[in-house]
């Protein structure tokens, strides 16, 4: 029996998987440049075939499960994590009208999907029957839940400025000025919260090698490990896309000039996403890992009060000057 997959869905999934593969290569190249070494340059010209070689290596490896693990949950956890990282793209507009489903509650949809992501990690840690995997899963769950609160309050600030949860309308509201300029402190907090939400350095505490070996995926090999890996990098691209949509005008050109308007909006969107992905990699190369208590303190004692305090003056200014949408 064949399952028909619409071309629109394939048009999102295939470029995303290709982007994840070359994002890994770009990360290794940038890390090598920062550390004054060459990086991968053997497989293909300039190492361009290295992602293909890594993918084949993972596919051909034998999937090994711990003898005491819950087999069904152990196998389903990476699948759930990877699928959630894909379905979130259903409401992300790449250009005006270029979106799979232009929901009026797109913002709430994204927040709901990101909240579900923690379940795959918790199930992976619990079903592995390993203390290291379980401790990594608990850390990840606490970290993701903590920073989702700050992300929610930050998005309320954007929501107040626009008056809509539709992502296309949020982008069109930035025709005069990108929200990242008047709300620059909010943009910085949102990006740092995205680092913590995706378990990326310097907040990669769930995968701290010196403490937890490899965190919640320590018992995974072959395609199970590959799906967790793909899910993590797909979430990186998603969060970079959200930073672009909410604060850098999405597909809108940098300047309102005729020459820039000739460039397709999807190209502008991709350029801005690549900028945030470069920041992801640069932060990993430049900053040391936080201690766990510092990470949680930053989320609850700094970002939560600041993001909440930011909602009040923004809404007050909009009401005072009658700028409410």
Curated annotation (Swiss-Prot):
Entry superkingdom: Eukaryota
InterPro entries: NADH_UbQ_OxRdtase_su1/FPO, NADH_UbQ_OxRdtase_su1_CS
One biological process term in Gene Ontology: aerobic respiration
Catalyses which reaction(s): a ubiquinone + NADH + 5 H(+)(in) = a ubiquinol + NAD(+) + 4 H(+)(out)
E.C. designation(s): 7.1.1.2
A Pfam family hit: NADHdh
Coiled-coil stretches noted in the UniProt entry, renumbered to this chain: none
Major enzyme class: translocase
Membrane topology: Multi-pass membrane protein
Locations listed in the record: Mitochondrion inner membrane
TM spans (from-to): 5-25, 68-88, 105-125, 144-164, 177-197, 227-247, 263-283, 302-322
Main location: mitochondrion
Keyword tags: Electron transport, Membrane, Mitochondrion, Mitochondrion inner membrane, NAD, Respiratory chain, Translocase, Transmembrane, Transmembrane helix, Transport, Ubiquinone
PANTHER family per UniProt: NADH DEHYDROGENASE SUBUNIT 1, NADH-UBIQUINONE OXIDOREDUCTASE CHAIN 1
Function text: Core subunit of the mitochondrial membrane respiratory chain NADH dehydrogenase (Complex I) that is believed to belong to the minimal assembly required for catalysis. Complex I functions in the transfer of electrons from NADH to the respiratory chain. The immediate electron acceptor for the enzyme is believed to be ubiquinone.
UniProt xrefs under HAMAP family: NDH1_NuoH (MF_01350)
Note: A stretch of 270 kb of the mitochondrial genome is duplicated within the centromere of chromosome 2 resulting in the duplication of the gene. The expression of the duplicated genes (At2g07785 and At2g07786) is not demonstrated. They are also probably not RNA edited and therefore differs in all the positions known to be edited.
Record's protein name: NADH-ubiquinone oxidoreductase chain 1
């Amino acid at each position: 029996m064949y399952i028909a997959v619409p071309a629109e869905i394939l048009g999102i999934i295939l470029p995303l998987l290709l982007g994840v593969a070359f994002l890994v290569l770009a990360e290794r190249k940038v890390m090598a440049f920062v550390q004054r070494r060459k990086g991968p340059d053997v497989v293909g010209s300039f190492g361009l075939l290295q992602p293909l070689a890594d993918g084949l290596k993972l596919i051909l490896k034998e999937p090994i499960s711990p003898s005491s693990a819950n087999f069904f949950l152990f196998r389903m956890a990476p699948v759930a994590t990877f699928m959630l990282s894909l379905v979130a793209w259903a409401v992300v507009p790449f250009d005006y009208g270029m979106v799979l489903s232009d929901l009026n509650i797109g913002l709430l949809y994204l927040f709901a999907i990101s909240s579900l992501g923690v379940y795959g990690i918790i199930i992976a840690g619990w079903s592995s029957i390993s203390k290291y995997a379980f401790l990594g899963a608990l850390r990840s769950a606490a970290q993701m839940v903590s920073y989702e609160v700050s992300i929610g309050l930050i998005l309320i600030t954007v929501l107040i400025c626009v008056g809509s949860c539709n992502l296309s309308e949020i982008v069109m509201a930035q025709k005069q000025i990108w929200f990242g300029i008047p709300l620059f402190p909010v943009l910085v907090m949102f990006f740092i919260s995205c680092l913590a939400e995706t378990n990326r350095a310097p907040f990669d505490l769930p995968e701290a090698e010196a403490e937890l070996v490899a965190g919640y995926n320590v018992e995974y090999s072959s395609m199970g490990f590959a799906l967790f890996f793909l899910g993590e990098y797909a979430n990186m691209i998603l969060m970079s896309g959200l930073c672009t949509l909410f604060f850098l005008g999405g597909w809108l050109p940098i300047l309102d000039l005729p020459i820039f308007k000739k460039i397709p909006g999807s190209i502008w969107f991709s350029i801005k996403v690549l900028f945030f992905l470069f920041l992801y990699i640069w932060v990993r190369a430049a900053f040391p890992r936080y201690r766990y208590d510092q990470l949680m303190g930053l989320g609850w004692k700094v970002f939560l009060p600041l993001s909440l305090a930011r909602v009040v003056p923004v809404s007050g200014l909009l009401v005072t000057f009658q700028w409410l949408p």
